[in-house]
Amino acid sequence: EQYLATEYYNLPLLGQLYGGKGELNLETLLGSGAQVVIDVGEPKDTIVEDLDALQEQTGIPFVHVSATIETMGDAYRKLGELLGMEEEAETLATYCDETYAMVKDVAEHVEKANLLYITGDAGLNVIAQGSYHAEIIDLLSNNLAVVDSPSSKGTGNEVDMEQLMLWNPDVILFAPDSVYASVGDDPLWQSLTAIQNGSYYEAPMGPYNWMGFPPSVQRYLGMLWMAKLLYPDAADYDLQAEVTEYFDLFYHCALTGEQYEALMANSIGKQ
């Protein structure tokens, strides 16, 4: 709540069409007065059938707008057309285009780090190479998590410690609320190069996970953070200034220095 305007606090919670936190609440949706429902993100294999069925069931138009980290600018332009907010949308679209181009340029001029992004209460889930949730991980690192069937879920693919040892990354990024706080004192985790060297970090969280849970436009914060963390010389920008600009544009929030420091508390390594 500290990042969002109070006018948004009491909006109805509709649930999710996809994902792991529950189903779309049609009763709440029908009572909300919504004139259109727009789903933005990965086009699931059954997206057309799913949205057609919901549209028929509710009488409310359902629209899907595909969005990847590369095409997020175009997604905002489409949203602007749909909602009659072209000028506002273009501001956000331009930001997305320019930020993606800047970070992509960093990725193209560095030797990418051998890295894993780890999730889960036990730290035994990974976001696999080639999955929708891994877009910024794959862009900015050599994502060692190569599996036969990458999961489309934000919780990733379950593995075991033996597999983590075989991959043995140089850098580990932990999802918020994973095992970041305890691995430094765990002998088993200490067998991994990244933990031995202190090259492990917790992804920032606020108001959502910056690395993509959900995989929204907030991943642009994750891109900026990850590039600066891994390649500080190539990522020639002021991370705090970039984060502050994002919060202003997307949340209309004047991020304070204290708030920024809190967001970064576990995200720049053990001090």
Q: Where are the model-predicted features located?
A:
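A short, structured surface patch at a secondary-structure boundary
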Residues: 1-32, 36-44, 142-145
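Extracytoplasmic substrate-binding proteins
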Residues: 48-125, 204-268
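A contiguous binding-surface segment within folded domains or other stable secondary-structure elements
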Residues: 32, 147, 151-202
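Short, structured coil segments at secondary-structure junctions
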Residues: 57-58, 140-141, 195-196
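Structural recognition of the beta-strand scaffold that forms the well-ordered cores
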Residues: 13-15, 36-40, 61-66, 113-119, ...
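A residue-level marker of the well-folded mature domains of exported/periplasmic proteins
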Residues: 126-127, 131-134, 158-167, 226
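Alpha-helical, coiled-coil/dimerization segments enriched in small aliphatic residues
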Residues: 18, 126-155
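Extracytoplasmic/secreted cell-surface and envelope-processing proteins
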Residues: 22, 45-49, 72-74, 124-128, ...
